[in-house]
Amino acid sequence: MTKRYWNITFEEMMEAGVHFGHDTRKWNPRMAPFISAKRKGIHITNLTKTARFLSEACDLAFDAASKGKQFLIVGTKKKAADSVTRAAIRARCHYVNKKWLRGMLTNWYTTETRLGKFRDLRTEQKTGKLNSLPKRDAAMLKRQLSHFETYLGGIKYMTGLPDIVIIVDQQKEYTALQECITLGIPTICLIDTNCDPDLADMSIPANDDAIASIRLILNKLVFAICEGRSSSIRNY
């Protein structure tokens, strides 16, 4: 994997609060190598390590994107949801930003069936077929369509399992992470000071609670994905 320069600066990481970890009483000892200090009762993440692993994650994302690999971005907590949506749309990635439905990947047949039903309902709505049904039936199907749009809207164009999954909050998205581990799908994961760095294939030590921190990390990864896709087109 070729190393590239991704313009990751300490100034922008400090400004985004990437270095702020959790309360020192709520830490995971396995994060010790990524912590540089304690300040006012919280752990401070070593930004040198953050820059290194974020750069490596960007290299991985670039290479995967240049080979046409498919990405899924997962971040369902309120502070991450908007950033996840914007990042995914910008990089043309699939995303989950509301709720991880258990078995979304490990029970792919069921997910695929739901997506098929979702597509059918969207078609029926666009063609006006739903409005021609009895009111009660139309209302029920519209509620179902709304449910699908909320929970499956970000993966409606996904036709198979993703090649790489980017996870914003390891603890919040633990079920998604476990499904990736079960299926052998590589993961890039933001890890705060209360996380386990050994669970993901590529861990980025960073504040996973601050919106600015989440946005910064995702922006770097998205830029790498976009550059990788552009590289693929140029070399075609």
From Swiss-Prot:
Keywords: Chloroplast, Plastid, Ribonucleoprotein, Ribosomal protein. GO terms for cellular component: chloroplast; mitochondrial small ribosomal subunit. Pfam families: Ribosomal_S2. One of its GO terms (molecular function) is structural constituent of ribosome. GO terms for biological process: translation. The keyword Mitochondrion does not apply. The keyword Plastid applies. HAMAP family: Ribosomal_uS2_B. NCBIfam families: rpsB_bact. Belongs to the universal ribosomal protein uS2 family. This is Small ribosomal subunit protein uS2c. The gene is rps2.
